[in-house]
Amino acid sequence: MAANSKTAIRLSLRAGERIFINGAVLRADRKVSLELLNDATFLLENHVLQPEDTTTPLRQLYFAAQMMLIEPAMREQAGATFAQMLKGMFAMFKDAEILNALKLVDELVHNGRVFEALKTIRAQYPREAELMGAQPVVWPVTKSGKSAGANP
């Protein structure tokens, strides 16, 4: 997510939790609150998709978009991969809900709002699973009672 200079963004991290900020990986050694005061691109650890979890087209698209956030040196290459994948998805998907979400994702990424695009993609995981005949992924609940996965 990009913090803008007009509004500070406050984040709370648990002990051991990681956050990716402008390509750097930080780990909290104890519960901590952070306030980002200027422009920064960040992604919380529980929103980071691992390569082995890119098992569906939308998860592969998410991974390409996430790389634009957490690997600034690869942003151009990841952006090209993302654009190519997105184009293929417009041809592959026939479902209006997913197509509308993909149009929004395209617009968000084009406007530099990659974090919001990631949220939009995650929101379509259940629909994609439904269309593929699989059960939607149910994210485990952490000890705090919050979902550890898809939607913040």
UniProtKB/Swiss-Prot annotation:
Q: Which GO terms describe its biological process?
A: bacterial-type flagellum organization; mRNA catabolic process; negative regulation of bacterial-type flagellum assembly
Q: What is this protein called?
A: Probable flagellum biosynthesis repressor protein FlbT
Family (UniProt): Belongs to the FlbT family.
The record's InterPro entries line, in alphabetical order, gives: Flagellum_FlbT
Annotated transmembrane regions: none
- This protein's superkingdom? Bacteria
Entry keyword RNA-binding: yes
What is the originating organism of this protein?
Answer: Brucella abortus (strain 2308)
Its job? Has a post-transcriptional repressor function in flagellum biogenesis. Associates with the 5'-UTR of fljK mRNA and promotes its degradation.
Question: What GO molecular function annotations does the UniProt record carry, in alphabetical order?
Answer: mRNA 5'-UTR binding
Keywords of the record, alphabetical order, are: Bacterial flagellum biogenesis, Repressor, RNA-binding
Pfam family for this entry, one: FlbT
